[in-house]
Amino acid sequence: MTAPGFTVSAFILLLHVSFVANYPSGKVTKSCGGMIPEHGHTPQSHPAHNISVSQKTFRPGDQIKVTLSGPPFKGFLLEARDAENLSGPPVGSFTLIDSHVSQLLTCEDVQGSAVSHRSPSKKTEIKVFWDAPSGAPNHITFLATVVEKYKIYWVKIPGPVISQPNVPPFTTPEATIAPMPTVPSVSHLTRSFNASDCGNKKFCIRSPLNCDPEKERACVLLSFTRDDQSVMVEMSGPSKGYLSVAFSHDRWMGDDDAYVCILEDQIVHIQPSHLTGRSHPIMDFGDPLEDMAWRLVDGVMQCSFRRNITLPGVKNRFDLNASYYIFVADGAAVDGRIHKHSQQPLITYEKYNVTGDPKNIGGSHSLLLLKVHGALMFVAWMTTVSVGVLIARFFKPVWSKALFGDAAWFQVHRTLMLTTSALTFIAFLLPFIYRGGWNWHAGYHPYLGFIVMVLAVLQLLLAAFRPPLHDPRRQMFNWTHWSMGTAARIIAVAAMFLGMDLPGLNLPGPWKTYAMIGFVAWHVGTEIILEIHAYRLSRKVEILDDDRIQILQSFTAAEAEGYVFKKVVLAIYVCGNLTFLTMFLSAINRL
């Protein structure tokens, strides 16, 4: 397996397998040899595009204009080959005429030996120069693969043959037609899968745990039933576009044995594939899957197939007598093309042997480190920092008595803020441990988190050098401390809003957004109430100046009344705050 530099979320993100859609920049070097897009569809048999050349003879060093034209197409791959050995490597190199629509590729370690599209925009004509190399074969032909759209493409469209002067005439080599792979028959399921035998006769993975696909449309079921030397696999879930399962040696993407059921034009295609490191999954053909069947009813897609437990000599297929982590995913697909998933795949907590004793298990859509990261950030920036701010802002006169050498309010405030910083630091490290580095696929969330971490550290340093109460610099400290703290809280809330939608911790919605808005309103409302109360309380104080003697009206009763009110508001606020926090922590725990 590959190193954990790329999260398991890529399992479905990289199932977006399209010669054009997966490679919008035209970087299709991996297809140089066979010139075959990995679409999982049969190429068209009658070319609709044409290759023409500016001359029919050449000498080493000549430049020959090559034109590919025809109906609008999105992607292409153009190469020159030895006309007498079409399976050989590309010959010579190309020079671009319009670098805005085409680009050079390096095939077989020869720079510029192929040309491809630069973008998936539609085009009707491509012109390039082919540079004849020294030692070129006697006869050269040009081959092009053209992609009109995902499932409509032509492979190795032949162009004219050009020859060097004074060489034996070109004779077309005897055609060798490769046998077409046998297409297994696919039938329709007559009834829905059921989960009654899970844990008894079937090895089942379900999400939510113990759900029933016959009663719940959202239920995702994966079951394995051993039958002598083969295993029957069943998948059921919402008909968003595809269902997939993969067997993995660890919890990271790479070198995995995968199977995908893809909905296209109200037909379900069952396709084996394999994953290779960080590259796109490769659809496999001719694999010995048997008894394939599918069903599409009431928004639920179901598919099944049988495969032998051991497949000696078949590349990329795992021995199912061993134990593996199991990935289960579903998502959208358009025209047979799998799209980026919105949620992490369900991953079993440990390795299992699906052909062993029947079990009924679940899994998690989020790995433990990411769940702990989210939980710690919620505790820190929803609860500890919020309560700490209220204490410092409104409760100085309420808890002014000394506690361990300092005012009680200050001790509580300092403890809560140190806790916030400690939780933030721990939570900040966890994604780096999980991914082995910076996450470049999480949008603005990690950048906002980094800013929050920096501000939290600066706040600690600033607080450590707090000037004495009557020092002239104290007012500047107060404003700086307040400004940085307020900025950190606002940015932290924004980071939490964004983090809730990331695939690694995709909390179910839309309640999460409303709950976060509710928390913000709850906190802001509490601050407004305490501000109004403080203002009204100050109005009760009347200072009279008579012969330089200040007479303070009796304030003891009003002061006591104000303290009680503040304590009641704080108690209610903490209860509400903990309610919001519990909602989010419970949602994380259920992932």
UniProtKB/Swiss-Prot annotation:
Localization per Swiss-Prot or TrEMBL: Membrane
Its membrane topology: Multi-pass membrane protein
GO molecular function: metal ion binding; oxidoreductase activity, acting on metal ions
SMART domains in the cross-refs: B561, DoH
Pfam families according to UniProt: DOMON, Reeler
Cofactor note: Binds 2 heme b groups non-covalently.
CDD domains documented for this protein: Cyt_b561_FRRS1_like, DOMON_SDR_2_like, Reeler
Protein name as catalogued: Ferric-chelate reductase 1
Cofactor(s) the protein requires to work: heme b
Domain Reelin residues, every copy: 13-179
One GO BP annotation of this record: intracellular iron ion homeostasis
Family (UniProt): Belongs to the FRRS1 family.
Domain (Cytochrome b561): residue spans on this chain: 335-533
Listed PANTHER family: CYTOCHROME B561/FERRIC REDUCTASE TRANSMEMBRANE (PTHR45828), FERRIC-CHELATE REDUCTASE 1 (PTHR45828:SF3)
Record InterPro entries: Cyt_b561/ferric_Rdtase_TM, DOMON_domain, Ferric-chelate_Red/DefProt, Reeler_dom, Reeler_sf
Transmembrane intervals: 6-26, 372-392, 416-436, 445-465, 490-510, 514-534, 568-588
Location (main, coarse): membrane
Binding site for heme b 2: H413, H481
Keywords: Electron transport, Glycoprotein, Heme, Iron, Membrane, Metal-binding, Oxidoreductase, Transmembrane, Transmembrane helix, Transport
